[in-house]
């Protein structure tokens, strides 16, 4: 009886160790296989794509439940706070159309701090970016003086526009 018990314990231990080691690999394979994933996982960062984050895949929940808890408790609150502050301080005076600006955010998994911010504009908005406070918005998001380059990405309307609601500033 003792021998059977030890074999069962050993088998369970091997299963859980294999599961733990393959967790990152599984998540990465989901990222590469599906471009609509909410999160792209790296060694130390989590990339928050501007897709509708309420869309949850069962595979993601099974592989990485911790990331969803992290999203609900940390990322969502910070994003909502950033959206409100940017709108109040900068965007209220700019007559841009709805869905003209997309914001990409990267948070550190180790510290939970926001580390990268990218703004993406529609083509017609690029003509007015000289007066648009891009650097100020990025600096405010990063909570520091912005000394790096500002990247402006051109966006062409696509079939996923109606999904970009979670991390887009609704400009009215």
How should these model regions be labeled?
Residues 21-172:
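Charge-biased low-complexity segments
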Residues 1-29:
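Bacterial Sec-dependent N-terminal signal peptides
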């Amino acid at each position: 009886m003792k021998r059977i018990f030890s074999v069962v314990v050993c088998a369970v231990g091997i299963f859980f160790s294999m599961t733990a080691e393959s967790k990152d690999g599984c998540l990465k394979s989901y990222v590469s296989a599906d471009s609509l994933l909410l999160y792209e996982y790296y060694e130390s960062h989590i990339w928050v794509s501007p897709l509708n984050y309420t869309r949850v895949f069962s595979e993601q929940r099974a592989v990485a439940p911790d990331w969803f808890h992290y999203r609900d408790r940390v990322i969502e609150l910070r994003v909502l706070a950033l959206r409100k502050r940017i709108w109040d301080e900068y965007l209220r005076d700019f007559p841009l159309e709805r869905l003209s600006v997309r914001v990409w955010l990267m948070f550190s998994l180790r510290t939970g701090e926001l580390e990268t911010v990218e703004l993406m504009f529609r083509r017609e908005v690029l003509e007015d970016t000289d007066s648009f406070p891009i650097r100020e918005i990025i600096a405010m998001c990063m909570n520091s003086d912005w000394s790096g380059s500002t990247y402006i990405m051109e966006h062409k309307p696509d079939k996923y526009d109606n999904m970009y609601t979670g991390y887009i500033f609704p400009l009215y």
